[in-house]
C-alpha cells in the first residue's frame, strides 16, 4: 500500500466522520435524548479511526522495511552520511555543472563534516539500523541527553529523506550497476 493510498483512505475516513458528525449534530438539535448515544458513536468512531491510522502507519513502516531488505547489502550497511554522499556523487556524475557544495567540498570538508555530525546524532548508524530502530517516546527523549539523542520528528524526517532518495531517478537508474559491480 503506497503513501498516497494510505492518505486517501485516511482522508475518506475523516470526510465520512465529518459528514456523520454533521448529521448527528442536526438530529441532536431535534432530540436531546440522543446526546449520550451520539457521544458514544463519536467516541467509537474516533477510536476506530485512531486504530486504523495506527495500523496504516505500521503497515507503511513494514513495507518500507521490506523494501529496504531488497537493496544491496552494501547500501544497507552504509551510514546515513555515506549514503547521502554517495547520492551526491551520483548526482555530480549525471549533472553537467557540478553544484557548489561539491565544488567546495575539499575546502570546507572538515568543518562541514563536524557540523553535520553535531546536527545528526545518529550519523554512525546504517540505513538498516535507522529504519528498523523503534521511535523514542516523549519520555525517553526528555530523559536523554539532547546533544546525543534524536527526537521522533527528526527521525521521521530522516526516514522520509531516505525514502525520497531511494525513489530518486538517479538511484533507480544506477541500481543495476550497484547490483552487478557492488563497488560502492
UniProtKB/Swiss-Prot annotation:
It comes from the Eukaryota. It comes from Dictyostelium discoideum (Social amoeba). InterPro entries: Borealin_N. Pfam families: Nbl1_Borealin_N. The lineage of its organism: Eukaryota, Amoebozoa, Evosea, Eumycetozoa, Dictyostelia. This is Putative uncharacterized protein DDB_G0285671.
Amino acid at each position: 500500500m503506497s503513501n498516497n493510498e494510505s492518505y486517501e483512505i485516511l482522508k475518506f475516513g475523516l470526510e465520512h466522520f465529518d459528514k456523520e458528525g454533521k448529521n448527528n449534530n442536526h438530529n441532536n438539535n431535534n432530540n436531546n435524548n440522543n446526546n449520550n448515544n451520539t457521544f458514544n458513536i463519536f467516541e467509537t468512531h474516533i477510536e476506530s479511526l485512531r486504530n486504523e491510522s495506527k495500523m496504516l502507519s505500521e503497515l507503511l513502516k513494514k513495507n518500507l522495511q521490506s523494501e529496504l531488505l531488497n537493496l544491496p547489502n552494501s547500501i544497507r550497511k552504509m551510514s546515513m552520511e555515506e549514503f547521502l554522499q554517495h547520492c551526491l556523487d551520483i548526482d555530480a556524475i549525471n549533472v553537467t555543472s557540478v553544484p557548489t557544495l561539491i565544488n567546495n567540498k575539499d575546502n570546507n570538508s572538515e568543518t562541514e563534516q563536524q557540523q553535520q555530525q553535531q546536527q545528526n546524532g545518529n550519523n554512525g548508524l546504517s540505513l538498516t539500523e535507522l529504519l528498523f530502530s523503534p521511535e523514542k517516546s516523549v519520555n525517553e527523549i526528555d530523559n536523554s541527553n539532547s546533544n546525543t539523542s534524536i527526537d521522533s520528528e527528526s527521525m521521521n524526517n530522516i526516514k522520509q529523506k531516505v525514502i525520497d532518495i531511494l525513489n530518486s531517478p538517479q538511484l533507480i537508474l544506477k541500481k543495476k550497476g550497484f547490483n552487478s559491480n557492488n563497488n560502492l
